């Protein structure tokens, strides 16, 4: 279990380098990745939910009930935003501590990745070159057919499609062959990288069991500290939600009562 926890931590922490590894972008810290993903997700949910609430309030039923859901939604969004601001520094501290504890292991894995990259780069370059050649060959074969279509207009469209079909299938088959060849070439390096990671973890487990235990203990300690520091912010969120929920409950009961009176009077 400890090895699994450490593996996930290492993969997560080194994952921030993956985009830099293949695309040569600036590396992004783990917290930045988590924060960006969480922010996008929360914003999408918040905006989408607000749109649905606004549509409901604009409907005939929404106007009749007059629940003031949009006001409550905005209050809730404000409370959640406040929670994010309060927890942000605490979570940042957690990731900073975890990064420090796994710095040595991440450096070793970065060296392994760089070594594998140098070995597989020629295969990637060769694949890209062959793919460009196939596309250019396909373009040269298709070009005369395009001119033929312009000359013959619509009556030759079906004939053109019949001629293009085998060419497209040929391109697909040749591309598939190149992909299979690339996969076969890269397989040993992928396995080599997996074995190196397993060896790193096994070395920690056997030759440095104390270090692995220490990683796990410190991670647990950081998580406990995170929970304790987040409690006040979560309590603030709960207190902020109470008026919103009470307002919603009162509005709903009033709407139901009014609807009942109208039904009884008919």
Curated annotation (Swiss-Prot):
Q: What does this protein do?
A: Participates in the reverse transport of cholesterol from tissues to the liver for excretion by promoting cholesterol efflux from tissues and by acting as a cofactor for the lecithin cholesterol acyltransferase (LCAT). As part of the SPAP complex, activates spermatozoa motility.
Subcellular location as annotated: Secreted
- Please list which residues make up the signal peptide: 1-18
Listed under subunit, the entry gives:
Homodimer. Interacts with APOA1BP and CLU. Component of a sperm activating protein complex (SPAP), consisting of APOA1, an immunoglobulin heavy chain, an immunoglobulin light chain and albumin. Interacts with NDRG1. Interacts with SCGB3A2. Interacts with NAXE and YJEFN3.
Q: Name one Pfam family in it.
A: Apolipoprotein
| InterPro entries associated with the record | ApoA_E, Apolipoprotein_A1/A4/E
Q: Which domain of life is it from?
A: Eukaryota
- Indicate the principal place this protein occupies in or around the cell: secreted
The gene name reads: APOA1
**Which stretches of sequence are listed as region 10 X approximate tandem repeats?**
67-266
Q: Where are the sequence repeats?
A: 67-88, 89-110, 111-121, 122-143, 144-165, 166-187, 188-209, 210-231, 232-242, 243-266
Q: Enumerate the UniProt keywords alphabetically.
A: Cholesterol metabolism, Glycoprotein, HDL, Lipid metabolism, Lipid transport, Lipoprotein, Oxidation, Palmitate, Phosphoprotein, Repeat, Secreted, Signal, Steroid metabolism, Sterol metabolism, Transport
Q: Which residues carry this modification: Methionine sulfoxide?
A: 109
* Family statement drawn from the similarity comment of this UniProt entry: Belongs to the apolipoprotein A1/A4/E family.
Species the sequence originates in: Mirounga angustirostris (Northern elephant seal)
Give one GO term, molecular function aspect: cholesterol transfer activity
One Gene Ontology cellular component: chylomicron
Q: How is the protein modified post-translationally, according to the record?
A: Glycosylated.
GO BP annotations listed: acylglycerol homeostasis; cholesterol efflux; cholesterol metabolic process; lipoprotein metabolic process; phospholipid efflux
Listed name of the protein: Apolipoprotein A-I
């Amino acid at each position: 279990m400890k090895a699994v926890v450490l593996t996930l931590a290492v993969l997560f922490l080194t994952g921030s380098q993956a985009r830099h590894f293949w695309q040569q972008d600036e590396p992004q810290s783990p917290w930045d990745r988590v924060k960006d993903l969480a922010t996008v997700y929360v914003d999408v949910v918040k905006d989408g939910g607000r749109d649905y609430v606004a549509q409901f309030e604009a409907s005939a039923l929404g106007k009749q009930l007059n629940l003031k859901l949009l006001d409550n939604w905005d209050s809730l969004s404000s409370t959640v935003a406040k929670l994010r601001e309060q927890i942000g520094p605490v979570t940042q501290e957690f990731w900073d501590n975890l990064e420090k504890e796994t710095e040595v292991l991440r450096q070793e894995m970065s060296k392994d990745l760089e070594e594998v990259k140098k070995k597989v780069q020629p295969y990637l370059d060769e694949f890209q070159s062959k793919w460009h050649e196939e596309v250019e060959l396909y373009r040269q074969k298709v070009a005369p057919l395009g001119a033929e279509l312009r000359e013959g207009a619509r009556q030759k469209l079906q004939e053109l499609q019949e001629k293009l079909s085998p060419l497209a299938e040929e391109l697909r088959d040749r591309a598939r062959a190149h992909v299979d060849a690339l996969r076969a070439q890269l397989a040993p390096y992928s396995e080599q990288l997996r074995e190196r990671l397993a060896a790193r973890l096994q070395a920690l487990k056997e030759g440095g069991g104390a270090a692995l235990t220490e990683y796990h203990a410190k991670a647990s300690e950081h998580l406990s500290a995170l929970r304790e520091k987040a409690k006040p912010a979560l309590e603030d969120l709960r207190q902020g939600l109470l008026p919103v929920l009470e307002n919603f409950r009162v509005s709903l009961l009033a709407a139901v009562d009014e609807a009942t009176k109208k039904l009884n009077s008919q």
